[in-house]
Amino acid sequence: MWYAIQVIGGRENTVLAEIKRTVDPECYKEVFSPKYETQKKIRGEWIITTAPLLPGYLIVDTRQIGAFSTQLRKVKALTKVLGSNESFIPLTRPEMKWLDSFTNNPHHTVGMSTAVKEGDRIVITSGPLMQHQGLIKSINRRKSLAFLEIQMFGRTITTKVGLAILRKQG
């Protein structure tokens, strides 16, 4: 089962490294920070960079959440497995399916999507957003970002993914 670990936003990579160093690997199958690719213009050149898909959260795949949570106390950074009272709540099947379909690679990274502008419509031509245009709530062309509204952790959240709009047509 997959569980969400809440961490301080911007410290996902640091906490991830500390968990891998500190927590007994027998307690979990995998722990990761889902990411997305986007483009940034640096010194006039477009560079592909990555950023957290779910800022402030890590995902752990474990069948021993009690043992993992106990081991997680060894980590010096602020960490909390999401749950209610004394039980931990795993990600639902749709949440796991969404994450897995978007990040279907060993690095758990959502690749860059590309699109063209036809009149006042944006048409996705390639990438993971091709089958999920309905999730797009807004687009920032200048920053090559699409903002998605999804159900995750029992509530509606807005997240970003990379979207390069190549040219205008029509």
Regions from the language model: what does each represent?
Residues 1-121, 143, 147-170:
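Acidic-enriched and Gly/Ser
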Residues 127-129, 139-144:
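Short, conserved beta-turn/loop elements at beta-strand boundaries and strand-helix junctions
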